[in-house]
């Protein structure tokens, strides 16, 4: 393979990654959420959502309602949590939410940050679930939990890139 073909292949790969990044950012802007797509990582929302389901979020609604399924993040923790709004309270121009997993016995008070009794809708919510695809996100779980699967996939992708003659 000559230099021109290698550069063309490199540009094609860069184009794919750039296109994916631009699509992600556009979706983030439209949904008004820094993470408009998340994967369910636990069984806390069964039977509504199963582990591995992909959730599509929307954060343009002014307020969440009791019964809505929301995704939130706790300060200092990087894993988003998918649970249903159990109660809501209103303060001065603020909405506070108490959440609970459908499959959990207790509300999420023990999951919140220290001295935090409710989620702040503006600062803690990533978005409200509007649609989902069942089991499609299970590949993400396999990639994070199984290092052999991750290395096999990376090896396959690298080998495919080397062997493709385009």
From Swiss-Prot:
Q: Name one GO cellular component term.
A: signal peptidase complex
Chief localization class?
endoplasmic reticulum
Region spans: C-terminal short (CTS) helix: 152-163
Tell where it localizes.
Endoplasmic reticulum membrane
UniProt keyword list: Endoplasmic reticulum, Hydrolase, Membrane, Protease, Signal-anchor, Transmembrane, Transmembrane helix
> Which EC class is the enzyme in?
hydrolase
Q: What is its EC number?
A: 3.4.21.89
Locate the active site: 44 (charge relay system), 83 (charge relay system), 108 (charge relay system)
Any idea which GO molecular function terms this record carries? serine-type endopeptidase activity
SUPFAM superfamilies under this entry? LexA/Signal peptidase
Those parts of the protein on the Lumenal side are: 32-166
- Topologically, how does it sit relative to the membrane? Single-pass type II membrane protein
- Describe the reaction catalysed, as an equation: Cleavage of hydrophobic, N-terminal signal or leader sequences from secreted and periplasmic proteins
GO BP annotations listed:
protein targeting to ER; signal peptide processing
Question: Which sequence ranges are marked TM in the entry?
Answer: 10-31
Cytoplasmic compartment residues: 1-9
What's noted about domains in the record? Answer: The C-terminal short (CTS) helix is essential for catalytic activity. It may be accommodated as a transmembrane helix in the thinned membrane environment of the complex, similarly to the signal peptide in the complex substrates.
What interactions and quaternary structure are annotated? Component of the signal peptidase complex (SPC) composed of a catalytic subunit SEC11 and three accessory subunits SPC1, SPC2 and SPC3. The complex induces a local thinning of the ER membrane which is used to measure the length of the signal peptide (SP) h-region of protein substrates. This ensures the selectivity of the complex towards h-regions shorter than 18-20 amino acids. SPC associates with the translocon complex.
Q: Which family does it belong to?
A: Belongs to the peptidase S26B family.
Role, per record = Catalytic component of the signal peptidase complex (SPC) which catalyzes the cleavage of N-terminal signal sequences from nascent proteins as they are translocated into the lumen of the endoplasmic reticulum. Specifically cleaves N-terminal signal peptides that contain a hydrophobic alpha-helix (h-region) shorter than 18-20 amino acids.
Protein name, please?
Answer: Signal peptidase complex catalytic subunit SEC11
Source organism per entry reads Clavispora lusitaniae (strain ATCC 42720)
Lineage, uppermost ranks: Eukaryota, Fungi, Dikarya, Ascomycota, Saccharomycotina
